[in-house]
Design a protein with these regions (language model features):
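N-terminal secretory signal peptides and thylakoid transit peptides that target proteins
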Residues: 1-19, 23-25
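Extended ligand-binding regions for polar small-molecule ligands
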Residues: 25-29, 34-35, 74-83, 143-146, ...
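Extracytoplasmic small-molecule ligand-binding "clamshell" domains
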Residues: 32-113, 252
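Periplasmic-binding protein-like
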Residues: 56, 131-139, 211, 215-257, ...
């Protein structure tokens, strides 16, 4: 898919910081009050808006339908705009520029479901997770030979070349070894469309991918594919800010936690991700907690 040109979406707040009282703002359409650090307020006032970066070729989190950006992250962004009294501008750009752009200070926030890794945590701070990004597998619905993770022993598996599904192979090998199983042949693909086609054509027995993408695929084609177990240790996805921007990080965590407590986060997960995560951490993870690099 061609990455769309950059454009801006403006928040609907009519007056910048109009409802601020001693650094505490009252959301016009929400009963929650958000305490905003004065340093952060001055930064936003100086520029006049908060600038977030997203992509739009990452379904179900961010994608385009008839030229309109939609998805899980966009739904959360709409909620964020409703409870913040300052303007929020969104710039859409290719994935490769999002995290470096935030790290360099070009953007305030990477509002995209980025996988939390130790390497990224060296130059970014992550919010509390918004979804799980663990690796699972799918198989053909009619393949009765695979009923559990142990049944992957000796099976031919499809993964994306250079992707996190390939990086999860050591985790799977360790799990199989614990169950006295062994890893079978691994086939690498440039993209998952080819891997899924080979699964249908019985050239591979299962395909490994992040659990959200697989859940969406199985929801779309329940008569063809079946979701299996996680093959990696748990991993998470979150938004990211520049390293050391604790004021913005605290504000975003407050917002996300409020969405979790009022049930909105779960509702949006069910709608867009076709799976809900009941036990996501409520605090940002520390370096070393992420298993997939």
């Amino acid at each position: 898919m061609t990455i769309p040109r950059r454009f801006f979406l403006q928040a609907s707040a009519s007056t910048l910081l109009a409802s601020m009282v001693h650094g505490c703002i009252k959301a016009p359409s929400d009963s929650s009050a958000f305490s905003i650090d004065q340093t952060l307020l001055k930064q936003i006032e100086k520029r006049g808006y908060l600038l977030v970066a997203t992509e739009d070729d990452y379904p179900p989190f961010e994608f385009l339908v008839n030229g309109k950006p939609i998805g899980f992250d966009h739904a959360l962004l709409d909620r964020l705009k409703k409870v913040m009294p300052f303007e929020i501008r969104q710039e859409i750009l290719p994935w490769q520029g999002i995290l470096p752009g935030v790290a360099e200070g070009k953007y305030d926030l990477a509002l995209t479901a980025a996988g939390i890794t130790d390497e990224r945590s060296k130059w970014l701070d992550f919010t509390m997770p918004i979804a799980e990004s663990s690796i699972a597998y799918i198989k053909r619905k009619d393949d009765s030979s695979i009923k559990s993770l142990h049944d992957l022993t000796g099976k031919t598996l499809g993964v994306q070349q250079g992707g996190v599904s390939l990086a999860a192979i050591p985790d799977l090998a360790a799990k199989l070894k614990q169950q006295k199983g062994t890893l079978g042949p691994i086939r690498q693909y440039r993209g998952f469309a080819e891997a899924y086609q080979d699964l249908l054509n019985r050239r591979v027995d299962a395909v490994l991918h992040n659990i959200v993408s697989l859940s969406v695929l199985v929801n779309e084609k329940p008569a063809i594919f079946e979701l299996g177990e996680r093959v990696s240790r748990q991993a998470y996805a979150a938004w990211a800010v520049k390293k050391g921007n604790h004021e913005l990080l605290d504000l975003l965590n407050h917002f996300l936690n409020s969405q979790r407590e009022n049930g909105e986060l779960k509702t949006l997960q069910a709608k867009w991700l076709k799976i809900t995560f009941e036990n996501l951490p409520t605090q940002p993870l520390l370096p070393g907690d992420r298993p997939i690099q």
